[in-house]
Amino acid sequence: MAGQGFTRSEWNKIRETLESDPARYGLPDRVYGSVVLASFNIRKLGSTSSRTKDTWEFLAYVCRRFDLLAVQEIQDELSGLRKLQELMGPEFDMIVSDKTGVFPGEPGVGERLGFIFNRSIVRRTEIATDISYDRSKVLNAISRHNDEIHAAMAPYAKKLRNYIAMLEEFDAGIRSTKPKKPKFNVKMPTFLTFIRAPLCVSFEAMGHPGTNPYQFMAINAHLYYGDYMSDRRQEFDALMEWIIARLRENDKAYYPNFILLGDLNLDFDKPETDRARIEKHLKAFNPQFGDDAHVNFPFLDPHPGRNEVFRTNARLNETFDQIGLFFRDKHFPTHLDNANMGQDERGFDYGVFGFVNLFSEALNNKPMAALTNDAKKKFLARFEHKVSDHMPLWLRLPLP
């Protein structure tokens, strides 16, 4: 049954298992006086026919626990996203980007980025934009790294010239077989622009009457995976540079608080040392700001009571997805607060909804780690495409 998804009776077992103890699998409660922000890469979220009725209902059951949900891998076809929003309930609204990552009419893998939000708690305000590096920034990078870029591009440029020559011969009837265009596989020495432009939207999370709301710019990003680790680091560092630069402008920014939610593809050649390197890099921003502003990536720290950081992919070996806070508002938690997360039901907390172990315990009577490698592979094939190969992660904030 690999790749066939779950049967109706299996979905019933999954629902019963989840409803018996949602907290066991990291699904947050809806708690009055708090707001839950989340990010979920829902694999190839396109047409309604791509998933069964039971799968859609499961996704909606999970997603309605979140007051603001950043969704990645939305396809050009929006019927699936609309169905998810409809199943979540009439109190939910959405905003979605146009397709990014591929030029219109050209081959490639493009996608949309979107937010679904609970209007009773979260209000969208005036700003909705993508994040990009302006032309002068790109030209300056090309100028500074011209020799390195030329050297990196040379092998591909040669293949492309040969392809064009053979294509002309094919069009002229000299060559009987149409040549195949070479894949663009170049290790760029510097960042030029985002493969998929992140989406930035302004929101308010409304608190109790007479209090000031959380005001923030939510950034939804699905950063480059690609063929080279250096490419991933370049995109991540470029996005951090943009957010930090905007945060420094303070009053010029629409809201001087930014929340990054997305699939940052932060996998690591050497997980422990690389994770420590990134954490040190991010926390180094805090002394620069003093008490005026802070940077906090809670998912880089083990949650209190856990020995290791959360994994966010279905194979349970990477933390691709992240939620990052860049803020001046004193209501947000600093990295020093991470050690005390989860002590109050409506206080600061964070987690991952571990549907992988939910599925395995419901249908195999054991967690995923207890399966043989072959059994893991076969079981993953049943839901990595039908549900997703990423799990949703979330952050709870107490409302003012």
Specify the residue positions occupied by each region the protein language model found.
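Residue-level marker for buried hydrophobic side chains located in beta-strands
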Residues: 37-38, 260
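A long, amphipathic alpha-helix that forms part
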Residues: 229-253
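Active-site surface patch of divalent metal-dependent phosphodiester/phosphate bond hydrolases
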Residues: 32, 36, 48-183
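Long, contiguous juxta-domain segments that are non-catalytic but functionally important
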Residues: 1-28, 36, 167, 171-185
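Metal-dependent phosphoester-hydrolase catalytic domains
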Residues: 1-24, 77-78, 120, 137-140, ...
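Extracytoplasmic/secreted cell-surface and envelope-processing proteins
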Residues: 47, 77-82, 103-106, 125, ...
